[in-house]
Amino acid sequence: QCYIMTGFYTAPGETVTIPLMKGISPELMKVNDHDDITRWWEVMDRSTGQPVPPEQWSYADGSVTVQAVPFHEYTVSFLAYLIWDPVHMYNATTNGWTNFEHQITFDVRQPKTHKYSMERLRKFIAEHPYVNVIRYTTFFHQFTLIFDELKREKFVDWYGYSASVSPYILNQFEQEVGYKFRPEYIIDQGYYNNQYRVPSKEYRDFQAFQRREVAKLAKEMVDITHECGCEAMMFLGDHWIGTEPFMPEFKTIGLDAVVGS
């Protein structure tokens, strides 16, 4: 899933209604209103920099209505499902593909998906005995890549962590760090903690947590690869969040090689 922030909306009176998916491709993302929105979403009064209490806003038909202070600016930070893999969407759009099925990403951190992925890896190696190098492209989480309704690139950050989230992951993060997660830790006033920003302690905590968890899971796949008699190579690029070679956790994965595009 991915954290997204709406545009800034100025309240013309005592209420303001904010459409969530304006400027975002409906083929790429779908609003996650399944999980507790009062827990995982955040409405911000950007004029004061303070969150709006959940009892002062409501969601219906793809929009959030806020009990507002006139002329203050508001945004909504919300979770969205990635219903089309951003890299596949990029390739399809760039190359003008037609008549094809959209690929989706799945969360290997979830127990059932984790089990399936490890079994699938063993099955692939067993069924392809002529293969002696497994090249992973890459491990698990895509960097931030968002398209608008016309399938144009709206926002890209090769180092962005905003698409590496889910309530399952964030609950684990809270248990480890001992404080409550806020969407603003990732949204960062709409800057999404891009590389020109000074990261907050909370965002750095989240990055460190993600790197540890991703490295642990990637090592499991590399160990299976070695156990089955193959070398493990990582493509440096797509879905590489948490496997940055310049970070200390990377060396624990045990890869034999890294290749770039």
Tell me the role of every PLM-derived stretch.
Residues Q1-K30:
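N-terminal low-structure segments adjacent to metalloprotease catalytic domains
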